[in-house]
């Protein structure tokens, strides 16, 4: 009786064999085995990823490791387009990378709804004022914004609708 190894099991084994490479790529604050465990969970949730181009899949895992992000759908995602897999950092992951850079003091992103009080000014002294409606229907989302303050007290604003 011969046992056949499925492509999913084979790829999970490949991830385990790459533990040293992941350890080298990951920030020192991250454990390579936890990274591999999350990567394997990603494959279990979306087994079609192992049918895609293996090089693009492995590049996705390695890029996530280099950025110090887990492919958990919150920090980053492995998304299949045709036969290739793309590494997509998510908002939570981007914020994590910025915090870990040591260059950002605070950062936030918020959704503004049509019944919130919202005002912003551009120019040499940009300013955002957002007072969410506490009681009642906030309405539909109308825009989002992000604010970042750097460790040298620089302030950056971005409003997107």
Feature annotation, model-predicted:
Residues 4-5, 10, 14-161:
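Binding-interface segments
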């Amino acid at each position: 009786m011969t046992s056949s190894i499925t492509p999913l099991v084979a790829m999970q084994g490949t991830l385990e064999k790459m533990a040293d490479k992941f350890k080298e790529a990951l920030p020192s604050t991250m454990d390579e085995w936890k990274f591999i465990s999350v990567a394997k969970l990603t494959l279990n949730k979306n087994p079609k990823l192992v049918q895609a181009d293996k090089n693009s899949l492995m590049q996705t895992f390695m890029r996530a490791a280099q950025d110090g992000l887990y492919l958990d759908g919150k920090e980053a995602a492995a998304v299949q387009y045709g036969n290739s897999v793309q590494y997509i950092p998510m908002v939570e992951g981007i914020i994590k990378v910025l915090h870990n850079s040591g260059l950002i003091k605070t950062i936030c992103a918020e959704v503004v709804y049509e019944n919130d009080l919202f005002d912003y000014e551009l120019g040499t002294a940009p300013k955002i004022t957002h007072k969410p409606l506490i009681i009642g229907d906030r309405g539909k989302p109308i825009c989002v914004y992000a604010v970042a303050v750097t460790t040298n007290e620089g302030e950056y604003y971005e409003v997107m609708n």
